[in-house]
Amino acid sequence: MTDAERASAALVVRAGLVEHGLEFDEPRPGVFTAALPGERKLQTACSLRVGEHSLAISAFVARNPDENREAVYRWLLERNLRLYAVAFAVDHNGDIYLDGRIPLSAVTPDEIDRLLGSVLTYADESFNTILELGFASSIRKEWEWRLARGESTGNLEAFRGWLERSP
């Protein structure tokens, strides 16, 4: 692709981020970082990089699970079968990401909308399941510690059902 085609793709990405009201940085031309707001996962850190032939997107979803990694990874792989444009991946530390690429020729305002929407939806919808599968012991300890001290359990409410069942 030419410099003009890469610049055009970067312009479309920039306009899409602005259109969605997202605060973003552009540390280098064609490299964007933004935080996508969610409900279950309050923010998803996301980067978009205009490359030689494609637009790459990568979003941090969760750190390396403390336990039950095989079940977490199996769930992610099964989930990948239903995802659009991105897939779950793990880095060398075991941290979980959504990662994808589209050809520069496919970079349009509608496709940027779909891409950002996919990342936001998949990160948000998957977050609690990843936590339940990969961090259950830590969540249970935190829950019990807060209850014993009369502390708020507000940010653990999504897990109340299985936390209140016997261990």
What residues fall within each predicted segment?
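Short, highly charged C-terminal tails/helix-capping segments
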Residues: 131-167
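Short amphipathic alpha-helical segments
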Residues: 5-12, 68-72, 111, 115, ...
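A short beta-strand-loop-alpha-helix capping motif that often carries His-Thr
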Residues: 33, 88-101, 140-145
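N-terminal catalytic cores of peptidoglycan-degrading enzymes
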Residues: 1-67
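Short, internal acidic amphipathic alpha-helical interface segments
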Residues: 58-99
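A generic structural motif
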Residues: 61-65, 102-111
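Conserved short hydrophobic interaction patches
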Residues: 16, 20, 75, 79-83, ...
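A contiguous, mid-protein "functional segment" used to position or interact
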Residues: 105-145
